[in-house]
């Protein structure tokens, strides 16, 4: 009997089972213990293969692929700390709903806790973060292929969002020629190999039903809060709110067109919050709200009913309102709850939104990050998409810009970490094939610098704007101790990215004004390559501009 041959047959069943659940993209890191999984994936023509040498970046690449494809994406890594590097991407997927399938190779049980090399306790290492965790046994013909495939099917068939961890121990030898070992074991699955359906099919999840009193609530004074959603959902939500005559507070990730722009500015005005107090119902569609003033208002508002609609399960309301948690696809929910044409009830807020935008426009000429955030809608590629980093940049875009309705916007706003942002952007571009504008800060770029290797392989133009404000200037907005702020919070690195771009043979520009930036962008959109544009700005200008605008708008 050939151990290596049966390892590969066992792995082939696992990989084939994944294809029955929509897995097309598979991300592979180098490793020896994962050889059976890697070779099985390589031999399966249903997969699009992606590789990367850094498992943390690989997990985020898969996250980006899953964001766009809306399908589960598989990841293969070897044993040891390689597995632990997948933790950040798994956590993010659990909070934002992408489906990741982590296939982690492992040493067999007799090599654990005895000093064997690269052998750690992998079963259960991700605690409660996966939706399902499976610790497979060592491959053996004593366990039927039916058990193996139905175990995989059960986990994936009930997966609605988040990750599945499948731990796969393999004994040596891992290499060798294929022979007939395990062929009859594999063939007991019969014509399943020629089929395209799962061996075990789970019943679909039940979603929230139509709210029978909707006809009553839609006649009341309501507010729509739009969080993270798809581009198509964003357009539908905007029309729905407009028909109802309800004010729409749109997050940067809502893709609604933000008909009342600069919400995180005007929500700091007492006239706005006073008018919003008249709302009898708030309907929040989508989660992961960004703006600080929006979150403060959301926490303090007291409508008669607060409804949250999202297809991600869980509470999704840190303010714990009295109301309804409705688990449903947003577009489907809107169809079940049609709008009735009514006149807008808010008078003051549209005026404040217009005045706030005019205040922002009055400051747009200076070459800085706040101004870039406002101008970003002018720089979006046609038929393209935007990927926004975390910390200060996403808050500035949320507060100061007005993105087009239905224009795809992606970000990692679940756990809101700055790790893996470039890798996620690479996955977003690969899955869509669209021109992509990605914007991150300098520390975020440094954190995921080796992901520039992934950006060498793009199918359409990708522009990475690195806003270099020399450190974590988000902390300039917080009451951090002034004497310790630079050393322990901002951590300026005093670096530039020209040589990093050169190391990975990427185009690079460092514009000094808007004309140079626009020229660099126009050139970048002409060729299907990656261009790094480093925008060096004064350290605290972005944070100070936001604070000044907040003060100005609060007194309108």
From Swiss-Prot:
It comes from the Bacteria. Binds 1 thiamine pyrophosphate per subunit. The keyword Glycoprotein does not apply. The keyword Metal-binding applies. Keywords: Magnesium, Manganese, Menaquinone biosynthesis, Metal-binding, Thiamine pyrophosphate, Transferase. Its EC number is 2.2.1.9. It is an enzyme of class 2 (transferase). GO terms for molecular function: 2-succinyl-5-enolpyruvyl-6-hydroxy-3-cyclohexene-1-carboxylic-acid synthase activity; magnesium ion binding; manganese ion binding; thiamine pyrophosphate binding. Gene3D superfamilies: 3.40.50.970, TPP-binding domain (3.40.50.1220). Catalyzes the thiamine diphosphate-dependent decarboxylation of 2-oxoglutarate and the subsequent addition of the resulting succinic semialdehyde-thiamine pyrophosphate anion to isochorismate to yield 2-succinyl-5-enolpyruvyl-6-hydroxy-3-cyclohexene-1-carboxylate (SEPHCHC). Belongs to the TPP enzyme family. MenD subfamily. This is 2-succinyl-5-enolpyruvyl-6-hydroxy-3-cyclohexene-1-carboxylate synthase. The lineage of its organism: Bacteria, Pseudomonadati, Pseudomonadota, Gammaproteobacteria, Enterobacterales. The gene is menD.
């Amino acid at each position: 009997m050939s151990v290596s041959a049966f390892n590969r047959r066992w792995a082939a069943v696992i990989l084939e089972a994944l294809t029955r659940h929509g897995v097309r993209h598979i991300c592979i890191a180098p490793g020896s213990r994962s050889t059976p999984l890697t070779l099985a994936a390589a031999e399966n023509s249903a997969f699009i293969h992606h590789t990367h040498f850094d498992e943390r970046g690989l997990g985020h690449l898969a996250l980006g692929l899953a964001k766009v494809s809306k399908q589960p994406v598989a990841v293969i890594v070897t044993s040891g700390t390689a597995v632990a590097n997948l933790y950040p991407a798994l956590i993010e997927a659990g909070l934002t709903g992408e489906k990741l399938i982590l296939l982690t190779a492992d040493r067999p049980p007799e090599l654990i806790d005895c000093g064997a090399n690269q052998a750690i306790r992998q079963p259960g290492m991700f605690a409660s973060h996966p939706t399902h965790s499976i610790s497979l046994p060592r491959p053996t013909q004593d366990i039927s292929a039916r058990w193996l495939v139905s175990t995989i099917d059960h986990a994936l068939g009930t997966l609605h969002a988040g990750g599945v961890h499948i731990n796969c121990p393999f004994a040596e030898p891992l290499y060798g020629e294929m022979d007939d070992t395990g062929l009859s074991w594999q063939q007991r699955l019969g014509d399943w190999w020629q089929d395209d359906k799962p061996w075990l099919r789970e019943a679909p999840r039940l979603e929230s039903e139509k709210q029978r009193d909707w006809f009553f609530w839609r006649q009341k004074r309501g507010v729509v809060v739009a969080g993270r959603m798809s581009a198509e959902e964003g357009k539908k939500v905007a029309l729905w709110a407009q028909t109802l005559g309800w004010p729409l507070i749109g997050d940067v990730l809502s893709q609604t067109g933000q008909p009342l722009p600069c919400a995180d500015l005007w929500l700091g005005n007492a006239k706005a919050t006073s008018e919003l107090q008249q709302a009898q119902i708030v309907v929040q569609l989508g989660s992961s709200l960004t703006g600080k003033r929006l979150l403060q208002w959301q926490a303090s508002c007291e409508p008669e009913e607060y409804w949250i609609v999202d297809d991600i399960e869980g509470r999704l309301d840190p303010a714990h309102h009295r109301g309804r948690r409705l688990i449903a696809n947003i577009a489907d929910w809107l169809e079940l709850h049609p709008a009735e044409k009514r006149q807008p009830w808010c008078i003051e807020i549209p005026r404040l939104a217009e005045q706030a935008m005019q205040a922002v426009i009055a400051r747009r000429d200076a070459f800085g990050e706040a101004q870039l955030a406002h101008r970003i809608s002018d720089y979006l590629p046609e038929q393209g998409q935007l990927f926004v980093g975390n910390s200060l940049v996403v808050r500035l875009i949320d507060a100061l810009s007005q993105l087009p309705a239905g224009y795809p916007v992606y970000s990692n706003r679940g756990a809101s970490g700055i790790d893996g942002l470039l890798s996620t952007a690479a996955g977003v571009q690969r899955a869509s094939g669209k021109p992509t504008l990605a914007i991150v800060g300098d520390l975020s770029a440094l954190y995921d610098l080796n992901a520039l290797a992934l950006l060498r392989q793009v199918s359409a133009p990708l522009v990475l704007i690195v806003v270099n404000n020399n450190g974590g200037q988000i902390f300039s907005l917080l009451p951090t101790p002034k004497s310790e702020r630079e050393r322990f919070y901002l951590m300026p690195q005093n670096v530039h990215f020209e040589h990093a771009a050169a190391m990975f043979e990427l185009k690079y520009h460092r514009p000094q004004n808007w004309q140079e930036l626009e020229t660099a962008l126009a050139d970048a959109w002409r060729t299907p390559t990656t261009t790094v544009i480093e925008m060096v700005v004064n350290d605290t200008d972005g944070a100070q501009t936001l604070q000044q605008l907040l003060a100005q708008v609060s007194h309108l």
